[in-house]
C-alpha cells in the first residue's frame, strides 16, 4: 500500500508572510500525522523563504512517522542533513527566482556533484532520493549516482492541457516506474498532484510514496487540515 508524505512548506509560507510565529508547521505536522499521514516532507531552501532551521530541528525531535528533507546538493545542506538525520534526503534543483521547484534535477549534467553528495549522505547512514523528470536518461544517471530512490516529478502530467497530453505524460511515468524497478531504485512521486488527478497516477502502481503539499494545504484552508489529510490518505491508499 502506498504511503502519503504531507509537505508542510506552505504552512511555513503563510507564517513567513507576516513574519510571526503562526501558523507553526511543527503543529501542522502533528495534526497531519494524527490524520493518517505516513510522513512529513519539508524543503529547507538556501534562502530560507519558508521552512526555517528551527522548524527542521523541532520536526526531527517531534515527528513520529518519517521525515523527508528536500534539499539542494550543496555542502551547507549536506552538512545540515548529516547533523539532523532525516529519514530520507531528497535532492532537488533550486533557483532563487522560482516560486516552487520547477523541474527535476539534471543528474546527467551534474552527475559528479550529485554522486558526491549522495555518497556523503549515505556514508552518514541516510537514504537518498533524487527528484527527477520521468526521463530514461535521467533515471539511468540516477542509478549511476548511487541514489537509493527517485522521486518522479509529476508536474508535466498535472499541467497537461488536454486528455492526449495527459495520457502521454502518464505513459512516461509508467515507463519510469518500470525502468527504476529494473534498476533496483525505489520510486516516489510528487508535484502538482491533487484530489482530482491522484487516482490516475495511483492506478499505475509501483509508487511507494506520494509527496503532496499545495493541494492539501489549499483544501485545509476550507475544511481544516485533519479533514484535508484524511481525504488524501483515502485516495492514496484506496484508489
Curated annotation (Swiss-Prot):
<feature type="binding site">
    <location>
        <begin position="213"/>
        <end position="214"/>
    </location>
    <ligand>
        <name>3-amino-2-oxopropyl phosphate</name>
    </ligand>
</feature>
<feature type="binding site">
    <location>
        <position position="50"/>
    </location>
    <ligand>
        <name>1-deoxy-D-xylulose 5-phosphate</name>
    </ligand>
</feature>
<keyword id="KW-0664">Pyridoxine biosynthesis</keyword>
<comment type="function">
    <text>Catalyzes the complicated ring closure reaction between the two acyclic compounds 1-deoxy-D-xylulose-5-phosphate (DXP) and 3-amino-2-oxopropyl phosphate (1-amino-acetone-3-phosphate or AAP) to form pyridoxine 5'-phosphate (PNP) and inorganic phosphate.</text>
</comment>
<comment type="subunit">
    <text>Homooctamer; tetramer of dimers.</text>
</comment>
<dbReference type="GO" id="GO:0008615">
    <property type="term" value="P:pyridoxine biosynthetic process"/>
</dbReference>
<feature type="binding site">
    <location>
        <position position="192"/>
    </location>
    <ligand>
        <name>3-amino-2-oxopropyl phosphate</name>
    </ligand>
</feature>
<dbReference type="InterPro" id="IPR036130">
    <property type="entry name" value="Pyridoxine-5'_phos_synth"/>
</dbReference>
<feature type="binding site">
    <location>
        <position position="7"/>
    </location>
    <ligand>
        <name>3-amino-2-oxopropyl phosphate</name>
    </ligand>
</feature>
<protein>
    <recommendedName>
        <fullName>Pyridoxine 5'-phosphate synthase</fullName>
        <ecNumber>2.6.99.2</ecNumber>
    </recommendedName>
</protein>
<dbReference type="GO" id="GO:0005829">
    <property type="term" value="C:cytosol"/>
</dbReference>
<keyword id="KW-0808">Transferase</keyword>
<feature type="binding site">
    <location>
        <position position="18"/>
    </location>
    <ligand>
        <name>3-amino-2-oxopropyl phosphate</name>
    </ligand>
</feature>
<dbReference type="InterPro" id="IPR004569">
    <property type="entry name" value="PyrdxlP_synth_PdxJ"/>
</dbReference>
<feature type="active site" description="Proton donor">
    <location>
        <position position="191"/>
    </location>
</feature>
<feature type="active site" description="Proton acceptor">
    <location>
        <position position="70"/>
    </location>
</feature>
<comment type="similarity">
    <text>Belongs to the PNP synthase family.</text>
</comment>
<feature type="binding site">
    <location>
        <position position="100"/>
    </location>
    <ligand>
        <name>1-deoxy-D-xylulose 5-phosphate</name>
    </ligand>
</feature>
<comment type="pathway">
    <text>Cofactor biosynthesis; pyridoxine 5'-phosphate biosynthesis; pyridoxine 5'-phosphate from D-erythrose 4-phosphate: step 5/5.</text>
</comment>
<dbReference type="GO" id="GO:0033856">
    <property type="term" value="F:pyridoxine 5'-phosphate synthase activity"/>
</dbReference>
<dbReference type="Pfam" id="PF03740">
    <property type="entry name" value="PdxJ"/>
</dbReference>
<feature type="active site" description="Proton acceptor">
    <location>
        <position position="43"/>
    </location>
</feature>
<dbReference type="InterPro" id="IPR013785">
    <property type="entry name" value="Aldolase_TIM"/>
</dbReference>
<feature type="binding site">
    <location>
        <begin position="9"/>
        <end position="10"/>
    </location>
    <ligand>
        <name>1-deoxy-D-xylulose 5-phosphate</name>
    </ligand>
</feature>
<feature type="site" description="Transition state stabilizer">
    <location>
        <position position="151"/>
    </location>
</feature>
<feature type="binding site">
    <location>
        <position position="45"/>
    </location>
    <ligand>
        <name>1-deoxy-D-xylulose 5-phosphate</name>
    </ligand>
</feature>
<keyword id="KW-0963">Cytoplasm</keyword>
Amino acid at each position: 500500500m502506498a504511503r502519503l508524505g504531507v509537505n508542510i512548506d506552505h504552512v511555513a509560507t503563510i507564517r513567513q508572510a507576516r513574519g510571526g510565529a503562526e501558523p507553526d508547521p511543527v503543529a501542522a505536522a502533528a495534526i497531519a500525522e494524527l490524520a493518517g499521514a505516513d510522513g512529513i516532507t519539508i524543503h529547507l531552501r538556501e534562502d530560507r523563504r519558508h521552512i526555517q532551521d528551527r522548524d527542521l530541528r523541532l520536526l526531527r525531535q517531534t515527528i513520529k512517522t518519517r521525515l523527508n528533507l528536500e534539499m539542494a546538493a550543496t555542502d551547507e545542506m549536506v552538512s545540515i542533513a548529516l547533523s539532523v538525520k532525516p529519514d530520507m534526503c531528497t535532492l532537488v534543483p533550486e533557483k532563487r527566482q522560482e516560486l516552487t521547484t520547477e523541474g527535476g534535477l539534471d543528474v546527467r549534467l551534474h552527475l559528479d556533484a550529485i554522486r558526491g553528495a549522495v555518497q556523503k549522505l549515505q556514508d552518514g547512514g541516510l537514504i537518498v532520493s533524487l527528484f527527477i523528470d520521468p526521463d530514461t536518461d535521467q533515471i539511468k544517471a540516477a542509478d549511476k549516482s548511487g541514489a537509493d530512490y527517485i522521486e518522479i516529478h509529476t508536474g508535466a502530467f498535472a499541467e497537461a492541457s488536454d486528455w492526449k497530453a495527459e495520457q502521454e505524460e502518464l505513459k512516461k511515468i509508467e515507463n519510469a516506474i518500470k525502468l527504476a524497478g529494473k534498476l533496483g531504485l525505489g520510486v516516489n512521486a510528487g508535484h502538482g498532484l491533487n484530489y482530482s488527478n491522484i487516482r490516475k497516477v495511483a492506478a499505475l502502481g509501483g509508487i511507494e510514496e506520494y509527496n503532496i503539499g499545495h493541494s492539501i494545504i489549499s483544501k485545509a484552508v476550507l475544511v481544516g487540515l485533519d479533514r484535508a489529510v484524511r481525504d488524501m490518505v483515502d485516495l492514496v491508499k484506496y484508489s
